[in-house]
């Protein structure tokens, strides 16, 4: 509980910093990067502090949850995973700021420097996600059946044995997926290919989430026969 309060304080300070930085940005800033690493969408600079609200909201909602809804079932694991997710969102909130400081709304989105910045940011995102997946993998198998956190499919929620088997498998898919994503991040950095960075990320997500979902369905049908 103390950790999430520290995270909330950090998230609020981060939001204040984002607001102060936003005041000095152009009124129109880059908001979206396509699969080729080019900026293809612009909008109001005040979208940046809105993104900065995400870690604040995660922390606030979790604090409310701990007071009124949290049980002892997965308390220890939840108190590690949720604050970590909130902390990880904080550096993500600065991605648009980085682009805004480098480019204005008149920048040609195909300029080489734009693609270079895009690659650096996607590599950063891949590494953070990889570490998050690996971190979560150490706790998945010990998660008890619940409606809030874990691999929640219709079949894991209906059957406790399916829940246990799916999360045991998920421990390995998350860990393997995280390691593959780290390797992929290095490859993206070396090859300078934004398109394949996105394709690789999608493939890893299929490994991490798709396999356990299909497995839970298969196991549930097997038990019901």
Positions of predicted regions on the chain:
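Ordered, amphipathic secondary-structure segments that act as subunit-interaction surfaces
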Residues: 64-117
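Select subsegments of transmembrane alpha-helices in polytopic membrane proteins
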Residues: 6-8, 50-52, 61-63, 81-89, ...
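Membrane-water interface of transmembrane alpha-helices
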Residues: 21-25, 57-68, 135-151, 215-222
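Active-site and channel-lining beta-strand-loop segments
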Residues: 19-50, 149-158
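Short membrane-interface loop/juxtamembrane segments of multi-pass integral membrane proteins
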Residues: 153-169
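Small-residue-rich transmembrane alpha-helices that serve as helix-helix interface/gating elements
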Residues: 128, 196-212
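N-terminal membrane topogenic signal
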Residues: 1-11, 46
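Alpha-helical transmembrane segments
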Residues: 41-55, 118-136, 203-204
């Amino acid at each position: 509980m103390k950790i999430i309060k520290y995270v909330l304080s950090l998230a609020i300070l981060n939001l204040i910093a984002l607001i102060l930085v936003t005041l000095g940005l152009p009124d129109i800033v880059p908001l979206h990067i396509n699969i080729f690493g080019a900026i293809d969408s612009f909008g109001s600079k005040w979208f940046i502090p809105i993104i900065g609200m995400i870690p604040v909201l995660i922390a606030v909602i979790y604090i409310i949850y701990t007071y009124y809804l949290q049980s002892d079932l997965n308390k220890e694991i939840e108190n590690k995973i949720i604050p970590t997710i909130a902390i990880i969102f904080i550096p993500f909130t600065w991605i648009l700021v980085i682009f805004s400081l480098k480019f204005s709304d008149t920048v040609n989105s195909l300029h080489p420097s734009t693609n270079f910045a895009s690659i650096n940011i996607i590599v950063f995102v891949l590494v953070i996600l990889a570490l998050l997946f690996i971190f979560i993998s150490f706790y998945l198998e010990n998660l008890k059946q619940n409606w809030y956190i874990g691999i929640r499919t219709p079949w894991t929620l209906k059957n406790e044995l399916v829940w246990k088997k799916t999360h045991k498998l998920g421990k390995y898919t998350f860990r393997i997926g995280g390691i593959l994503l780290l390797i992929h991040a290095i490859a993206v950095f070396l090859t300078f290919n934004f398109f394949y960075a996105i394709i690789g990320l999608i493939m890893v997500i299929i490994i991490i989430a798709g396999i356990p979902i299909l497995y839970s369905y298969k196991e549930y049908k097997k038990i019901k026969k």
